[in-house]
Amino acid sequence: ELTDRWRQQYKPAMDRVRNGQAPWQHLDQLHRQSLEALAGEFGLALDEALLQRITGFWHRLRPWPDTLAGMHALKADYWLAALSNGNTALMLDVARHAGLPWDMLLCADLFGHYKPDPQVYLGACRLLDLPPQEVMLCAAHNYDLKAARALGLKTAFIARPLEYGPGQSQDLAAEQDWDLIASDLLDLHRQLAASA
């Protein structure tokens, strides 16, 4: 239950920053604060070392089964850039731990904003030196795709029905007619290859 509750704090913590209710803090800091609050709520006494260790779990996330093969297939024809609400140090660790072959990491701390703020999507296009209509955001989150589409980016929904755990009730399916809707990254590669 603690783990699920901690994961559920992700978006509300970022929203407090986005809405000006809290000063800018990167995602590791937000995860740490959420963990401290939940530890108190659950009556757990976590010392500094344990707080750091548990917060560090986010740095060692495992990729979905299709991720590596799909990314390598896509990388043969496209630039692959992570556009993440994670901070750069977090995403570097995730990439190294999982062997993710990103060409570039575009993280929230580069922009001082979290998605779905426009500064993140447009900042990514600027850093890639591409107009929005030549950039495709691939995501498992409909809110993310909606914000990207509103700014002119192409969109691809990747189904991840366990993204939020076994009780997931949101983002189970595409909620709009995105440019592409794929079951995984290998399916996305097949669809892109067929449309080329």
Predicted regions and their residues:
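A metal-dependent, Asp-based hydrolase signature
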Residues: 3-52
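Residue-level preference for long, well-ordered alpha-helices that form the structural scaffold
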Residues: 24-27, 63, 137
